[in-house]
From Swiss-Prot:
One of its GO terms (cellular component) is cytoplasm. Coiled coil: none annotated. It comes from the Bacteria. The gene is eutC. It is an enzyme of class 1 (oxidoreductase). This is Putative dehydrogenase RB0419.
C-alpha cells in the first residue's frame, strides 16, 4: 500500500506564502545547482501557437533531498479574454529513494508564482545595490505584483513604478500594491519614465519584442528579466545584455531560451562565452556586482531545481500542519 498527499491551491496558499523562508529555499536551490551534482534535464516545451499557448515540463533532482518534483506548467495567454487565468498547472513530488509519488500539488501555478518571485528576490539581493529603494516593474499581472512584494522582503523599497501596455491594468496594480505594501506605487504610461532613477528594474511580460532599451539604462541599475522563457520571447534590448554584467540562472538554458539567446543571435555575444550563474554568485564561486555604478542583468528563465525546492517546502509544511488529504492505494 502506498500513501500520497493531495493538496489543493487553497491549501497551498495557506501554508506556502511568499515569505523569507520561501526566498531562502530557492536561494539554497541555486546554491546547490552550483555546488552539487544536480540532475536537471532541459525543459520539455509544447507550443500551441493558434491559441497563444505553451506547456512546459520541468524537473530536477538534488542529492540529499528525499524527493524531486515534476511540474506541468501551461501558459495560455489569451485566456483572460474568456475569463480564465493565463497560467495553471500542478506539481508531482516523488520519492528520491523509491520513485513513489509522495504528493500531488494541485496548485494551478501558484507554487510557480511563488518560486519565480522568490528567484527575483534572490537575484536582487545578490546583484542590486544594498541601498536600492526605487523599483520599476514592467507588466501588471500576478508575477509583476509578486515580484514587487518579493523585492520588499530583501531591499528597503520606498517607491515603485509600474508600466504595462494596458494602462488600466497598470493603474489597478499600482492601487492594489500601494495599499498592500505601504509605500508609494505609481502607474507610468511611458516605460522610460518608469525606469528613470530606478535602482531595480523587473520585467515580467511575455513580449516578443524588447520593451527595455539599452540606451535607457543608467549606471548602478539592476535588471531582473523574468519573461523570456521561450525562444520567441524577448524583453530586453540585446545591446543591453552586451553592455551589462550578465548573470544567468542556467547558462545552458539562457543560451537557448533567455535574453542571452537574442544577444547571441544578434552577434553581440559569443555562443561560447562563459558567464556567471546565479548559484555560483551565491556560493561565492563567481563575482556578481563589484561596483556601485555597474549595470547588472539577471536572466531568469526558470529552472526545475526551483520547482523541486518549493515542492519540498510545501510537502514539509503540509506534514507539519497536517494539511491536505491522504490518498491510499
Amino acid at each position: 500500500m502506498t500513501r500520497m498527499k493531495i493538496l489543493t491551491e487553497a491549501e497551498l496558499r495557506g501554508i506556502v506564502p511568499l515569505d523569507r523562508e520561501a526566498v531562502a529555499c530557492v536561494e539554497d536551490a541555486f546554491r546547490a545547482l552550483a555546488t552539487k551534482a544536480v540532475a536537471m534535464p532541459p525543459i520539455l516545451r509544447l507550443d500551441i501557437p493558434e491559441h497563444r499557448g505553451e506547456v512546459d515540463v520541468k524537473t530536477a533532482y538534488v542529492p540529499g533531498l528525499d524527493g524531486f518534483a515534476i511540474k506541468i506548467s501551461p501558459g495560455f495567454f489569451d485566456n483572460p479574454k474568456i475569463g480564465l487565468p493565463s497560467t495553471n498547472g500542478m506539481m508531482v513530488l516523488l520519492s528520491s529513494k523509491t520513485g513513489l509519488v509522495q504528493a500531488l500539488l494541485l496548485d494551478n501555478g501558484y507554487l510557480t508564482d511563488v518560486r519565480t518571485a522568490a528567484a527575483g528576490a534572490v537575484a536582487a539581493r545578490r546583484l542590486s545595490r544594498e541601498d536600492s529603494s526605487v523599483a520599476a516593474v514592467f507588466g501588471a499581472g500576478m508575477q509583476a505584483r509578486l515580484q514587487l512584494e518579493a523585492l520588499a522582503l530583501v531591499r528597503p523599497i520606498r517607491e515603485a513604478r509600474i508600466w504595462a501596455r494596458d494602462a488600466a491594468k497598470a493603474e489597478a496594480a499600482a492601487i492594489a500594491l500601494g495599499g498592500k505594501l505601504g509605500f508609494a506605487v505609481k502607474a507610468e504610461t511611458d516605460p522610460r519614465a518608469a525606469i528613470t532613477g530606478a535602482d531595480i528594474i523587473v520585467t515580467t511580460t511575455p513580449s516578443e519584442t524588447p520593451v527595455l532599451k539599452a540606451e535607457w539604462l543608467e549606471p548602478g541599475q539592476h535588471v531582473t528579466a523574468m519573461g523570456s522563457d521561450a525562444e520567441h520571447k524577448n524583453e530586453i534590448d540585446p545591446h543591453a545584455i552586451a553592455r551589462a554584467t550578465y548573470v544567468a540562472d542556467s547558462l545552458k538554458q539562457t543560451r537557448r531560451l533567455g535574453e542571452l539567446h537574442h544577444a547571441i543571435a544578434a552577434h553581440l555575444m559569443s555562443a561560447e562565452a562563459e558567464f556567471p550563474e546565479l548559484g555560483q554568485v551565491i556560493a561565492g564561486l563567481k563575482p556578481g556586482r563589484t561596483r556601485a555604478d555597474e549595470i547588472t542583468i539577471a536572466d531568469l528563465t526558470g529552472t526545475g531545481i526551483q520547482d523541486t525546492a518549493i515542492a519540498t517546502l510545501a510537502f514539509a509544511r503540509a506534514n507539519a500542519a497536517d494539511a491536505g488529504t491522504t490518498f491510499e492505494s
